[in-house]
Every structure is written in C-alpha cells, then in structure tokens.
C-alpha cells in the first residue's frame, strides 16, 4: 500500500478514536466511531482475496447496523429527555439500545456471529488492529455510561460471552478463530464487572490488549495461521517459543502470570456483590479457555515439525529475535501479578 495512503488511514483511525474519547455530545461520539470504522476498511480489503472481501463486507454491514442502532438510541434519548450529552442518557429504552449497539460493535455474545469469520479473513496485522485498537472507542463510551446501564443486561452479555468464548474455541484449528473466541471470552469478563467496578474493566482491557498484541506479534513472526504450523517455532527461535508459551498461559488466566490478576479481582468483586452463580459459571468457563490455550502451548513447545534432518536447527532456518515492542508487551503480559497491590492502591 502507498505510504501516503497508509499514513492517512492510520491518522484517520487515531482521529476517530480521539473524537470518541474527548466527545461528550452523542453526535460527536458517533462521528468518531464512524471515522474509525471507515478507516480500517481499506486495510482489510488490501489483500484482494475473496476471503478478505467477504470479511470486509461482513464487517461493514455489522458495523453500519450497530452505528444506526446507536444513532437511533441517542436520538430517542434526545427526543424524550432533551439532552444530547453522553452522560445524560436517562431513558432506559435508549440505554438498552445503546448497550446492544455497542455489544454488536465489539462482538459480545450473542451478537458475536461476525467476529470469528471476519478475523479469519484478515491477515495478522489487520487482525491485531481489529482485536485491540477497534475496541478502544466503544469501551470509552461504555465506561462513561457504566452507572446508567442495566446491570442485569450487562451480566447476561458477559456470562453468555464467557460461555460462547470457552466452548467456541475448543474445536478450532485456525489460530485467528481461536484468538477471536479468546477475545469474546475476555470481553465477557470485562463487561460483567463494568457496572460494579469500571476501573477493573479498564485494567482488564489494558492487560488484554498487551497479551493480544504479544500473541499476534509472535504468530506473525512465526508466520503461523494454523495450530500445526506453529510446531516449528522452537526451531526458529527457542526464546520466542518460551515467550509464546508464557503469554498463552497468561491469556488463559493461569497463576502466577499477569492474566490471572483481572480474573481473580473480578471474581472477588462478583462475590462481594453476592453474584455467586455468575462467578461460578465464569470460573468454570475459564477452564475451557485454558484448555485450548494449553493445546496451543503443546503445539508450540512440546511438538517438533517433521524434517529430513535430525538436528535442533538447520542452516536454512532464519534467526528470529524478539523486538523491543514484543519484549515490552511480553513483560507486561507475563510479570505483572506481583504489582497487584500497587495497582489496587492506584485504583482506589
């Protein structure tokens, strides 16, 4: 892609997200979401592959539907209350419609149908943007609306997402689909606690973005899109295969890694709110997610790709060294659990 065009596209994505962050008027926020959506479409379609075209079409239709529903919710709220301010959504029907629209935008179950198929049709770089950056603007709105939203509806979306994310990833062999269901499950954890502790949602979102960034960068380095293609990662770089192992276990929420921290704090908060049954269901579904992460760990570090030479490494193998971005994100994804007391102190 032309560097000038790429610069304009990336600047537009940044502008759209910034507008949503700073906006307090519904139309300005909606405009930011639309700029964000339209900016990523050229990146999705640049491959000129039928699967990329299909993924882009699905993404555009889904996001357009969600944007129309969100605009309808804001107009309805302005009609009934006379307020266009983001934090003045006093009409319960408008708040419910806005929640459903934002759930469709980020891919919460049962409105998740588009996310695995779209992510599967994209290359890993664009998939990384879709799984991380494109979540920021909708979550900025959700965090501002959190006191006004229906807690039961958020709980329904959250628990359903953890169930779908856990079960959906079990029989997948495509890495991008596994990461899509992983995203759905993690979004479920975030949205469940949104009404009770927005700061925990923000903490979970930040850690999720770092862990997803590390995972996508590793798969891009290994040039892997299927489970059976990452078995040669140990030959390419033993250090990076160990980083992949630790990051995947952290995504699964295994102690003593960073990914355990938000799950632990969220379950603790749900228990304080006497939501024992949702907390139990989510903890059990986390075990299902951990199972398919363990499958990836087994394929990454405990299997060896078939080859004609019985050697640890061949002269043809290109040496892969982790970059500074990868090392930084991996460190945050793996070693943040001892910082929990400090983070809790900053949050209170």
From Swiss-Prot:
GO terms for molecular function: NADH dehydrogenase (ubiquinone) activity. It is a multi-pass membrane protein. Belongs to the complex I subunit 2 family. GO terms for biological process: mitochondrial electron transport, NADH to ubiquinone. One of its GO terms (cellular component) is mitochondrial inner membrane. It catalyses: a ubiquinone + NADH + 5 H(+)(in) = a ubiquinol + NAD(+) + 4 H(+)(out). InterPro entries: Complex_I_Subunit_2 (IPR050175), NADH_DH_su2_C (IPR010933), NADH_UbQ_OxRdtase_chain2 (IPR003917), ND/Mrp_TM (IPR001750). The chain crosses the membrane at residues 3-23, 25-45, 59-79, 95-115, 149-171, 178-198, 199-219, 242-262, 274-294, 324-344. This is NADH-ubiquinone oxidoreductase chain 2. It is found in: Mitochondrion inner membrane. It comes from the Eukaryota. Keywords: Electron transport, Membrane, Mitochondrion, Mitochondrion inner membrane, NAD, Respiratory chain, Translocase, Transmembrane, Transmembrane helix, Transport, Ubiquinone. Its EC number is 7.1.1.2. The lineage of its organism: Eukaryota, Metazoa, Chordata, Craniata, Vertebrata. Core subunit of the mitochondrial membrane respiratory chain NADH dehydrogenase (Complex I) that is believed to belong to the minimal assembly required for catalysis. Complex I functions in the transfer of electrons from NADH to the respiratory chain. The immediate electron acceptor for the enzyme is believed to be ubiquinone.
């Amino acid at each position: 892609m032309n560097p000038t065009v790429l610069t304009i596209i990336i600047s537009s994505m940044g502008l759209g997200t910034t507008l949503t962050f700073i906006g307090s008027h519904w139309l300005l926020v909606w405009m930011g979401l639309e700029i964000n959506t339209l900016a990523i479409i050229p990146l999705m379609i640049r491959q000129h592959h039928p699967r990329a075209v299909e993924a882009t079409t699905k993404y555009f239709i889904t996001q357009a539907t969600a944007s129309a529903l969100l605009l309808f919710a804001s107009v309805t709220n302005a009609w009934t209350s006379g307020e266009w301010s983001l934090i003045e959504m006093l009409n319960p029907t408008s708040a419910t419609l806005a929640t459903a629209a934002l759930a469709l935008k980020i891919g919460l179950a049962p409105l998740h149908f588009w996310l695995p198929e779209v992510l599967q049709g994209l290359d890993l770089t664009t998939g990384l943007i879709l799984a991380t950056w494109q979540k920021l603007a909708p979550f900025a709105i959700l965090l501002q609306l959190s006191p006004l939203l229906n807690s039961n509806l958020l709980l329904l979306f959250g628990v359903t997402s953890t169930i779908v994310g856990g079960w959906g990833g079990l029989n997948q062999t495509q890495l991008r689909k596994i990461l899509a269901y992983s995203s759905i499950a993690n979004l479920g954890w975030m949205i469940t606690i949104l009404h009770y502790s927005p700061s925990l949602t923000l903490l979970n979102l930040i850690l999720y973005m770092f862990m997803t960034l590390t995972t996508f960068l590793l798969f891009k380095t290994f040039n892997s899109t299927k489970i059976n293609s990452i078995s040669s990662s140990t030959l390419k770089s033993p250090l990076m295969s160990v980083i992949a192992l630790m990051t995947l276990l952290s995504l699964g929420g295994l102690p003593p890694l960073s990914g355990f921290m938000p799950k632990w704090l969220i379950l603790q908060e749900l228990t304080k709110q006497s939501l024992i049954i949702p907390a139990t269901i989510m903890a059990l579904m986390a075990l299902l997610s951990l199972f398919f992460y363990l499958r990836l760990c087994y394929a990454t570090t405990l299997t060896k790709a078939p080859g004609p030479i019985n050697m640890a490494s061949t002269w043809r193998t290109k040496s892969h060294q982790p970059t500074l971005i990868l090392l930084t994100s991996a460190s945050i994804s793996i070693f943040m659990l001892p910082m929990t007391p400090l983070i809790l102190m900053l949050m209170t």
